[in-house]
Amino acid sequence: MTNTDNMSPNFLRNAFRRLTITAIAPIVMTFEPFFIFPVVLITLARRGFVYILLPITAALILRATKVNYGPLTVSPTMHFNTPSIAVFAVLLVATTIASVFKPKLWRAFLVAIVVISILHAATPIESPVKGEGCNKISIELLDSETNFCFYISSAKTGKMWYYHATLHFMDSEGLVVNRVHLLTAALTFSSEVVEFRNEQGKFHAIFYSEVPIDSLKLKLCYFPETVIGSLPVVFCSSVDLEVR
């Protein structure tokens, strides 16, 4: 391609179209509670109907409580850490450069931006709990050590023992895996299985036993949150506990 070709009206028009799509894609993909399916976005881009996205974006801005440009803007419905923002920012810069000079590479980068935006938009928020009065339970996944607060109380009612167990997120350390999000939790004792119920991020289990319980097995199933958002891959871990 010659310098004359680089400055041709057709080249400039196509470059401007790709730049516009690059800027709009993360915004459209991360509005809450609105969502445009990736196939629709990519189809519009391939057909060159980029200006159709402008009124859609304007309408969403009027209805949304806050504009979320991928992980570059934090809103109450999403949370991001420094590695996530750095990865997204580098990818966004690379996509912007590729939109002018490398159209084929630009398409791949654009898809990556859309995927990251969706994963972050789908990442749940859990309020961490202080460690006071907690029995810390740790699980390890790749480079992450995630700690949960576990507490169990008991009382004797007639001939039965009453137990109330609570479980919720404390803190996490890791670069690739930032934390994990619980899906299910269950306690096993004397061949009995008790499922926790999830109440806004805090897990509770109430059960009875004819004899005092001195040991439990806790099974946790969760999915990891990485620098590109939560991954829909389920992992499970088991922890042996003593009841004092």
Swiss-Prot record:
Its main location: membrane. Disulfide bonds: none annotated. The keyword Hydrolase does not apply. GO terms for cellular component: plasma membrane. It is a multi-pass membrane protein. It is found in: Cell membrane. Keywords: Cell membrane, Membrane, Transmembrane, Transmembrane helix. It comes from the Archaea. The chain crosses the membrane at residues 20-42, 49-67, 82-101, 108-125. This is Uncharacterized protein AF_0399. It comes from Archaeoglobus fulgidus (strain ATCC 49558 / DSM 4304 / JCM 9628 / NBRC 100126 / VC-16).
